[in-house]
UniProtKB/Swiss-Prot annotation:
PANTHER family: ISOMERASE, L-RIBULOSE-5-PHOSPHATE 3-EPIMERASE ULAE. The gene is ulaE. It comes from Escherichia coli O17:K52:H18 (strain UMN026 / ExPEC). Disulfide bonds: none annotated. The keyword Isomerase applies. This is L-ribulose-5-phosphate 3-epimerase UlaE. GO terms for biological process: L-ascorbic acid catabolic process. Induction: Induced by L-ascorbate. Repressed by UlaR.
Length: 284
C-alpha cells in the first residue's frame, strides 16, 4: 500500500561525497528521508555517470531495492557548461547529447523526473538567438523524453529568463507536451520580486516536485534555514490548499561540511516543523 505521507527527500550534495550509492541511500534512510535526488552537474566526475556501464547502473538499482530509498529525480545542471542556447554549434550539440544520455540513464535506472536548469546560456551573453536556440533545444529534448516516458521539469532559477513560474509556464504552453512540467524552487522564487503565493497557485497542475531552500535577494545558495526571506509556512499552506501532494526536496550543499549528517538532520527538523505548522505533517 502506498504511503499517504508527504514524500520528503534530500539532495545528493547535502550528503558526504563519494560514488557508493548503497552507503548514500543507507544514510538517507537513517536520516528519515524517502528519496535522494541525484546530481549530474558540469563537473567531469558527475557527468561521467551518464556513461556508467550496465553493471554500475544495476548497482544503483540494487541499492534502491535493498534500502527502500528511491532515486526518482535527477538535477541536471550540466547544461550550464554545455547550454542548449549556445551559439557554438559544437557546444550545443554536446548539450543535446548530454540530454539524450540523461534520458537514457533515467530510463535505465527508474528516474522519473529530470530537473532542467533554465539557462539559455550561462557563461556567455544572452540574446534573441540564444533564446531561440534554447527553445528549439527544449523542443528536441521533450521529443526524446516523450519516447522514453521520462518527465523533463523546469526549475525556477537564479537567472532572469526563468525566475518565475509565470515565465516557465510560457514554455509549457509553447511545448504543449505532458512530458514537460515545472519543478519550482521556493527559495529562488522568493529571492526575486515575485508574488510567491500567486506564482505557486498559477503552477498547480504543472508542478511535479518542489525544491526547499532559503535565500536572500541575490544570494541563492548556502543560506541557513530561517536566515533568509522565504516564508516557508505560507508556501507550504498554499501548495497544500491548492491540491499539491507531490514530493519536497531539501536542497543543501553540505557534502564538504565537517559533519554533513548533522547539518542535514538540523535542516530536516527545521523544515518538518514548518510543514507541521502548515498542517502537512504531524509535529515531531
Amino acid at each position: 500500500m502506498l504511503s499517504k505521507q508527504i514524500p520528503l527527500g534530500i539532495y545528493e550534495k547535502a550528503l558526504p561525497a563519494g560514488e557508493c550509492w548503497l552507503e548514500r541511500l543507507q544514510l538517507a534512510k537513517t536520516l528519515g528521508f524517502d528519496f535522494v535526488e541525484m546530481s549530474v552537474d558540469e563537473t567531469d566526475d558527475r557527468l561521467s555517470r551518464l556513461d556508467w556501464s550496465r553493471e554500475q547502473r544495476l548497482a544503483l538499482v540494487n541499492a534502491i531495492v535493498e534500502t527502500g530509498v528511491r532515486v526518482p529525480s535527477m538535477c541536471l545542471s550540466a547544461h550550464r557548461r554545455f547550454p542548449l542556447g549556445s551559439e557554438d554549434d559544437a557546444v550545443r550539440a554536446q548539450g543535446l547529447e548530454i540530454m539524450r544520455k540523461a534520458i537514457q540513464f533515467a530510463q535505465d535506472v527508474g528516474i522519473r523526473v529530470i530537473q532542467l536548469a533554465g539557462y539559455d546560456v550561462y557563461y556567455q551573453e544572452a540574446n534573441n538567438e540564444t533564446r531561440r536556440r534554447f527553445r528549439d533545444g527544449l523542443k528536441e529534448s521533450v521529443e526524446m523524453a516523450s519516447r522514453a516516458q521520462v518527465t523533463l521539469a523546469m526549475e525556477i532559477m537564479d537567472y532572469p529568463l526563468m525566475n518565475s513560474i509565470s515565465k516557465a509556464l510560457g514554455y509549457t504552453h509553447y511545448l504543449n507536451n505532458p512530458w514537460f512540467q515545472l519543478y519550482p524552487d521556493i527559495g529562488n522564487l522568493s529571492a526575486w520580486d515575485n508574488d510567491v503565493q500567486m506564482e505557486l497557485q498559477a503552477g498547480i497542475g504543472h508542478i511535479v516536485a518542489v525544491h526547499v531552500k532559503d535565500t536572500k535577494p541575490g544570494v541563492f545558495k548556502n543560506v541557513p534555514f530561517g536566515e533568509g526571506v522565504v516564508d516557508f509556512e505560507r508556501c507550504f499552506e498554499t501548495l497544500k490548499q491548492s491540491g499539491y501532494c507531490g514530493p519536497y526536496l531539501i536542497e543543501m550543499w553540505s557534502e564538504t561540511a565537517e559533519d554533513p549528517a548533522a547539518e542535514v538532520a538540523k535542516a530536516r527538523d527545521w523544515v518538518k516543523a514548518r510543514m507541521a505548522k502548515a498542517g502537512m505533517v504531524e509535529a515531531a
